[in-house]
Amino acid sequence: PVSQDALGEAIRTYLLENPDVMAEVFENTQKYLIAEDEKRQSEMLKKNSDALYNDERDFSIGSPDAPITIVEFFDYNCGYCKRAFPDIMKLTQKNPDVRVVFKEFPILGPASEQAARVALASKGDGKYFAIHQGLLNARGSVSGAALSSLIEKHGLNADEIVTRGKNKDIDAHIKDVRNLA
């Protein structure tokens, strides 16, 4: 029988003399890892499909029956989210077969959390999208007096909306979105 040391040295020598074998092993490993990741993502999407696409607490634009649904997790103080908003609007206007579901994901601090709560609290008044647009179109962070002004600009009582935004249903919704993300 061949000793373990001798076998190890033979394998090492072979790999050093044939580096293409290691490249092939690396390539196959990459393919395997990518396939496993895609499988995991697919399973996650199936498991969370209703929470992603059909949560009645979320606001969406486009036909509910659209064959294509985009789910956007966003923060009102995220510069990338603000820059993407006009493109998302153009996409939905030019493509009636696209629906966008908006998921408040306030991760950039207390001002983000308050903005998300205000937007969600305004949904019952039919003003969610107007507030949403105002927050995403604003330069920089919107909080304090600027947030109150935005709320009142759309015919709502700022103190009432801020208070409504602090309820347990909105707490649960934001928590659920964070867990989903």
Describe each PLM feature range.
Residues 32-35, 106-181:
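Cysteine-centric redox/oxidoreductase cores and disulfide-bonded domains
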